[in-house]
């Protein structure tokens, strides 16, 4: 509102007061002619302050109304909105007049055939885009809706595959363990059979030796008995001879 204060360069020198040029020309005032009092000046300032806020409020209201209409028209029309939307500050009602002018300009722009043709062209473009997009939505809409269910199915299938692989691995491990246990059993049976076969052979040898020893003892005992039975000792008689036959 007020310009910045400038520093005072030419300071007045102290001395007796000098008469003003008007006082030189006109002389002193008559005693009846006095300046306005301080109270009257204060009342004038108060009235001016009351008038200025009212003017500013009217200008703001006018600018707000014009801006709202301008914004609405600029959305629908290219280059819409009046040029004189801003009100004149200090004059009440100027904003309302500017907004009315903006509304009239917007109506004129709507009635303009060029603006109507541009609006129709934009509407046709929007309809064409909608016609192109609707079949794609009809085709891919169910897929998009079923995406969560498809994801669930995929996760379940992956889990089932994992469980199947785990079951196969467990069955393979069990089969390997069973085969190893069977092999161990077979080796144990073979070793036990070999031990059984080796034991009778070793036991048969001493039996044979025992039988041979028994036979030898029997032969030894039977041989002297035969000799005793075969050759009885003859009884000799003194003074007697036996005839011998010579052939």
Curated annotation (Swiss-Prot):
Source organism (scientific name): Bacillus subtilis (strain 168)
Residue ranges with Low complexity bias: 1-12, 21-43
Biased composition (Basic and acidic residues): 170-196, 210-229
Pfam families documented for this protein: YqfQ
Record-linked InterPro entries: YqfQ
Chain intervals for the UniProt region annotation (Disordered): 1-43, 157-247
Protein name in UniProt: Uncharacterized protein YqfQ
């Amino acid at each position: 509102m007020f310009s910045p204060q400038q520093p005072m360069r030419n300071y007045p020198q102290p001395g007796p007061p000098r008469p003003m040029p008007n006082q030189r020309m006109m002389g002193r005032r008559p005693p009846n002619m006095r300046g306005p009092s301080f109270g009257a000046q204060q009342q004038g300032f108060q009235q001016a302050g009351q008038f200025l806020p009212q003017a500013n409020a009217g200008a703001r209201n006018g600018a707000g109304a014009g801006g709202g209409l301008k914004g609405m028209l600029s959305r629908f029309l290219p280059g819409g909105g009046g040029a004189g939307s801003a009100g004149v500050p200090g004059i009440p009602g100027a904003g309302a007049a500017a907004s009315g002018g903006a509304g009239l300009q917007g109506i004129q722009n709507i009635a303009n055939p060029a603006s109507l043709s541009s609006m129709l062209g934009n509407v046709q473009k929007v309809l064409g885009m909608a016609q192109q997009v609707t079949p794609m939505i009809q085709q891919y809409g169910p897929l998009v809706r079923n995406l969560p269910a498809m994801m669930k199915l995929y996760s379940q299938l992956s889990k089932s595959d994992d469980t199947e692989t785990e079951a196969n691995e467990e069955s393979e491990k069990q089969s390997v363990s069973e085969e190893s246990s069977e092999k161990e059993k077979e080796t144990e049976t073979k070793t036990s059979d070999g031990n059984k076969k080796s034991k009778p052979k070793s036991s048969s040898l001493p039996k044979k030796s025992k039988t041979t020893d028994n036979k030898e003892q029997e032969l030894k005992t039977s041989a002297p008995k035969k000799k005793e039975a075969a050759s009885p000792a003859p009884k000799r008689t003194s003074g007697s001879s036996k005839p011998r036959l010579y052939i």
